[in-house]
């Protein structure tokens, strides 16, 4: 909103005001690491940090992120379109397993069954080396791409989404989610808000879903 209003605030002033008000920045907590060595086929890094696209449904990216709550851990596995920043599909689970990945893919292909030539990017997590995942991509004509090992910048577009998600509805609000059901409902509401209401500079100040619709009408 500062960009929309053409306002700028020096970071030192922000830090000074935060100190005066005894406020602290939100810091990421324990991170989920899915890499377990070479347990399957490792694909080439086709994306190679080139996240630019001409239209929707050209490049997707996926990853898994962990949430720590009082009652246990939770994992979200979304697919994000690099053109629109839209969350194409997601699965929320208490366990990062292949059932989560299968559900995420099924939901994505139900929405968009014709995605031949699309590039799907991920890290080298065991899920993405798994034969089922690779076969599903191949069956739908999708080209698989993987980040280099241990290099989060190769998938920074998804890391940015995870940071935004956690800062806007999780950090500082953990006590608002006393159960998996409550947290799942909150995640669903946030994804709906993010896709259909939350404007972004990248999408010409439109929500991701509206930007996709406008882009596909132009095409």
Label for each model-derived stretch:
Residues 36-38, 122-124, 130-131, 146-166, ...:
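RNase H-like two-metal-ion nuclease catalytic core shared by retroviral integrases
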Residues 27-32, 120-124, 138-157, 173-178:
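RNase H-like polynucleotidyl transferase catalytic core
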Residues 91-113:
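Active-site beta-loop-alpha junctions of metal-dependent nucleic acid enzymes
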Residues 49, 53-88, 94-98:
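An active-site-proximal beta-strand-loop segment
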Residues 6-7, 52-53, 69-70, 124, ...:
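Conserved, non-catalytic sequence blocks in retroelement Pol enzymes and Pol-derived host proteins
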Residues 3, 14, 18, 47, ...:
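Mobile genetic element proteins and their domesticated derivatives, centered on retroelements
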Residues 2-55, 151, 207-216:
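Basic, flexible linker segments flanking DNA-binding modules
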Residues 138-142, 166-219:
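C-terminal domain-tail junction helix/linker
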